[in-house]
From Swiss-Prot:
ATP binds at A10, Y11, S12, G13, G14, L15, D16, T17, S18, A37, G118. The gene is argG. This is Argininosuccinate synthase. The keyword Amino-acid biosynthesis applies. The lineage of its organism: Bacteria, Pseudomonadati, Pseudomonadota, Gammaproteobacteria, Oceanospirillales. One of its GO terms (biological process) is urea cycle. It comes from Carsonella ruddii (strain PV). GO terms for cellular component: cytoplasm. Pathway: Amino-acid biosynthesis; L-arginine biosynthesis; L-arginine from L-ornithine and carbamoyl phosphate: step 2/3. Homotetramer. Keywords: Amino-acid biosynthesis, Arginine biosynthesis, ATP-binding, Cytoplasm, Ligase, Nucleotide-binding.
């Protein structure tokens, strides 16, 4: 009897990856090993483990990666001040490299030649997964079911479940949802109609401005080397800190986004996102940067943030250029130390106060009402004459 090949599947516990398990077993005769990364999905993790057992999986791997996710992926990303196309905080894209890293550890440990994922042939995740797989093992063989099988609709997936005795939730989900500590994302379903306004129940993580608190919340954040370390002068570990800011931002209506984005393969898609904690951190740290960083460093960092965001979105987290940019970014953050007090209210974030020992702001130098010894104002005439040369010639 031929020994079955082993394959490690990135398993979420959802309909798609549950069908993939049985399809890999029945159609390709694989021994399937599942890996589920706990990045803050809550009860979905326990459900995924339970479903894997029902699918007769012998080797089920589940790992709590929440702290590593925030410390080694989210915080380095937030230091970059990057947003994709000036909007999206990349909560899905930033999670995929960690999932891949841990999955490939299992593949190496069990000496498997194959790995698999549940990303479709239209989206970005197929690229993010597979670039990572090849980075860790250039010889690995990848099975991407959505690019192979003929199960091309939800109905065909449900019929496959019935035929193969796979238990599933018969209640149709309106959207494709991805969750982690960083964000919630919603795609597909009614959102494919760009004139459809999302219904309020869709937003699981934040309150609307109408339903959010009727009074402002004041938050004091302490930063060290570009990362938040305290809330209201109280220390938290990275996971606790992010959860706390998520909760505070949620009840204040912070971090909702409804956008049209350009996928890597060229298709435009609509996505709705909730990132309350990340939005607060990004705002606060950028305000500290404006206070502390030299003008040219600040400008240069904004330029490389554009490149950085594209690399992360397009699946190049492990690329040498992303790693190089990270070193430059982290160097700029050594002086980003201070305390900023924020007022969050009805979806808005504003500064209440800001202080840093590394501040370059001097009220005497910038004030119209005080005389500064830093330079003679009459020197500006020569400066302007030089600057105007290219407009005169």
């Amino acid at each position: 009897m031929k020994i079955k090949e082993k394959i490690v599947l990135a398993y979420s516990g959802g309909l798609d990856t549950s069908v993939i398990v049985k399809w890999l077993q029945n159609e390709l005769n694989f021994e399937v090993i599942t890996f589920t990364a706990d990045l803050g999905q809550g009860e979905e993790i326990l459900l995924a483990k339970k479903k894997a057992k029902l699918l007769n999986i012998k080797n089920i791997f589940v790992k709590n990666l929440k702290k590593e996710f925030i410390k080694n992926f989210v915080f380095p990303f937030l230091r970059s001040s990057s947003t994709y196309e000036n909007n999206y905080l990349l909560g899905t894209a930033i999670a995929r490299p960690l999932i891949v890293k841990e999955l490939m550890k299992i593949s190496y440990y069990l000496n498997t030649n194959y790995v698999s994922h549940g990303a479709t042939g239209k989206g970005n995740d197929q690229i993010r997964f597979e670039l990572g797989f090849k980075y860790f093992n250039p010889k690995i063989k990848i099975i991407a079911p959505w690019r192979i099988w003929n199960l091309n609709s939800r109905n065909s997936l449900l019929n496959f479940c019935i035929k193969n005795n796979i238990k599933f939730d018969s209640k149709t989900k309106k959207y494709s949802i991805d969750k982690n500590l960083f964000h919630n994302s919603y795609e597909g379903g009614n959102l494919d109609n760009i004139n459809y306004e999302p219904d309020e129940p869709m937003w699981e993580h934040t309150l609307s401005n109408y339903n959010s608190l009727d009074y402002p919340i004041y938050i004091s954040l302490t930063f060290k080397n570009g990362d938040p370390i305290k809330i209201n002068n109280k220390n938290y570990n990275v996971e606790e800190l992010f959860l706390k800011l998520n909760n505070l931002g949620s009840i204040a209506g912070i971090g909702r986004l409804d956008i049209i984005e350009n996928r890597l393969i060229g298709i435009k898609s609509r996505g709705c996102y909730e990132s309350p904690g990340a939005s607060i951190i990004m705002y606060a740290r950028k305000k500290l940067e404006s206070l502390i960083l030299d003008k040219e460093i600040y400008s240069f960092k904004e330029e490389i943030a554009l490149k950085y965001s594209k690399l992360v979105y397009n699946g190049y987290w492990w690329s040498p250029e992303r790693i190089l940019l990270q070193k430059i970014i982290d160097y700029t953050q050594t002086s980003i130390n201070g305390i900023i007090k924020l007022k969050i209210f009805k979806g808005q974030i504003n500064i209440a106060s800001i202080n840093s020992i590394n501040s370059l702001f001097n009220s005497k130098n910038s004030s119209f009402d005080e005389i500064s010894n830093l330079f003679n104002q009459s020197d500006s005439s020569g400066f302007i004459n030089i600057k105007s040369l290219r407009l005169i010639i």
